[in-house]
Amino acid sequence: HHGNVKAEATLANLDDGRVWYGSAVASEIHDMEWLAEHLPADGSIRLNSLTNTHTTLILAGPKARAILQKMTRINCSPEAFGWLQVLQGFVGIAPAVIMSVSFSGEQAFEIHLPNNQLHAGYLALCQAGEASGMGLFGSMAIESMRMEKGYLHWKADLITEFNPFESGLGRFVQMDKDFIGRTALQQMITAGPRKLLVSLDIACDHAPGHPGASVCADGDVVGTVTSAAWGHRVGKNLAYAFVDPAAAHIGDELTAVSYTHLTLPTSRSVG
């Protein structure tokens, strides 16, 4: 175990001996195989996939909590249902696991529903949000919002080639505790970072950055763009990139080279 980032997932304790593990669609098989490999041999823990039986609805925005309260008897007040909490109850007539988490950077809830009750849950959500002008949003919108917030995307900004400290996740790692890959990670910490994940403010108002584009400093390639999107609320052309530690200082001037061979000057700030 090399000490690098292995997966990205949401884990929730359901308080009845079950742990909910929600990962990216693209990593389902990878994560299932890795988890199965590390199950205790005595069979005391079982691993079940809910991919084919459940679907997730995302309710996000400043009115999300009020809309959620309209369609459930669960107490959705901030005091009873705070950030990073999970509750089980009904959405309309549909049984649901509801998590107070967000990938958009706004107040948001994940509503996990069994597929045979999905339509009922969706109708309850639409009815509860109608008076507030609630509408659908797509992946490009959430990509823009999560980049403004500084949230990282699996297999884009979070990849198995780099460790948590290089990926900006060091504050979540407790090196004084034992875990799989700890020895390898400690060796990499001692050796120093190979690359560092940084955020870029691209000084161009007509062309976005491109994931995979090279990042240069003084004519030398120093890194690669991992994600890019226009931040509509902050009015900035945003990107994330892994760059050499020497080029990872706030205010460093770098250049992102797009696939169309345009050069996009950047003014960098750490995310």
PLM regions: where:
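Short cationic amphipathic helices and targeting signals
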Residues: 8-13, 17-25, 55-59, 103-114, ...
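Hydrophobic alpha-helical segments, chiefly the membrane-spanning helices
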Residues: 270-271
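Glycine-centered loop/turn motifs
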Residues: 28, 79-87, 208-214, 251
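Short, conserved charged micro-motifs
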Residues: 29-30, 65-67, 117-123, 208-210, ...
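Conserved small/polar residues in nucleotide/adenosyl-binding loops
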Residues: 260-266
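Glycine-rich, acidic
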Residues: 38-39, 44-189, 193, 201
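Extended, compositionally biased flexible segments
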Residues: 1-18, 22-41
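Short beta-strand/strand-turn micro-motif
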Residues: 4-8, 95-99, 112, 177-250, ...
